[in-house]
Amino acid sequence: MRFVLHPAADAAYVHYEGSHANPFEPGAAGVSRVNGWWLAEAALLSYWPPDIAIARFRSAGMETAFIEQRGVQCYVSVASAFVIVSFRGTEVNDFQDVFDDARFALVRWNEAGAKVHHGFREAFERIEPQLADALALLGSERTIWFSGHSLGGALAVLAADRFGRAHGVLSIGSPRVGNAAFATAFDARFGAVTARYVSNRDLVTRVPPRRPFGYEHVGELRQIDVEGDVSGAAPPVLAPAERIKELARTQDALLDHMPRGYSVDIWNDYARSGD
């Protein structure tokens, strides 16, 4: 449970191990398996402080800038042909993060009727000006990819939608971000290049609920089952009696949220596939 709540406490983890033998595919049409691993590693590494994270991104061939604004943090990692923007997820000892997560009323996102989570929108808009400046300096010759875990996954989705330059988006263990109008419009633009990984019964991916609030997920579901296999099939809907039993296993559902677990499972899926 410690690494769920405090991922950076995992001092033994080696980020991007084997990255030079398994290079990123900057021109891939969407989130290929190897790109999924690179993006998951970036999402995981976003929990580490900049004095460590920047060196580890560099070990994989990326020069990185750290951006922070009132508790919202992201890394902009630049290689010769691509850029990865990775957002840090919720830190339970950060009051602003918890406050952002808790404000789940839907608020307007654009003029087309799309609405999004109030706290997520405000968190994104705190960091948006600095991130926009950083991306503008990079020009247009590199493909841009967004990633994040938990709250970070929600911010990655909002960033892709707002900036409109996403070659690919990865969310791991992400909550729902907006209403049906937002999801429909987002998927029309980026659904084919957005991978939404869900580990087994990760509790965070089920909130905010569809009813009565009207939230919907975006992107292509990539479900990781209890054996670590990845497919597009969601877990079966449980009968009422099974739901009660599952409530007693809340700790298991929280353990499914661990970002390291996502990165390892995504790597294993890539390694098994051979592509």
Language-model segments: residues:
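Non-catalytic, mobile gating and regulatory segments of ester bond hydrolases
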Residues: 1-147, 151-275
